[in-house]
Amino acid sequence: MKNVNVQSRISLQIRSCTAVVCSLLLVPGETLLPAQTQPAGASAQTTSAKIPPDQLDSLVAPIALYPDPLLAQTLAASTYPLEIIQLQQWLEKNKNLKDKALADAVAKEPWDPSIQALAALPDVVKRLANDISWTTDLGNAFLAQQTDVMDAVQRMRKKAQDKGNLKTTEQQTVETKVIENKSVIVVQQANPQVIYVPSYDPVVVYGPPIYPYPPIYYPTGYYVAGMALSFGIGVMTGAFWIGGWGWGCWAVCSGLV
């Protein structure tokens, strides 16, 4: 009974955490995280050292094409860089844990729910941990300029879509929706219970950057040079993420239903 209660509590925390990011994905440029989640001095940082759009575009380039539920978790997790390093080290020591056993074990760790949810995706954790400077910059930008970051995600998705590099596949669906007079590109898992992490070269999918893209990390065997998007083996996420998030929950997240 204790394990069930812990798992239920973690699932609810993950729902709450991702729902906040979902509301940001809903209408880029308008929705902000609740004020209490912003660190002291964030307002001053925004006005004194606001990151320009071109730099934000490059900052989000490595993850902008992630399916929305994974994008939400990754952005939230990037605000906890130390815990990302701790999770990577923990995963190295617990390679034998899989599925529910992994979910139960990680739920006992004192980490943010967004960090715990990434335990099922070690390649994403490795990407974030291997370039912790970029991850920290991404997290700081998300805390200080949430809507600007989401606008950047949409700009990069539009670039990839215009070049024919972002479209519906067996692994994910891509739709363009108009919400509150804004055109938004929605990326969802083809199977809500299975995540496929895309690997890609930003220069190939978006074109040459104005501001240099972060270094590229490719999971072993996942990416073929010159291809747009490559996908690895699908990962069942039911034990970690209960229910759908991202654009699929836009009405709930925005308070419309």
Give the ranges of each region predicted by the language model.
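N-terminal low-complexity segments enriched in Gly/Pro/Tyr/Ser
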Residues: 2-6, 10, 14, 21-24, ...
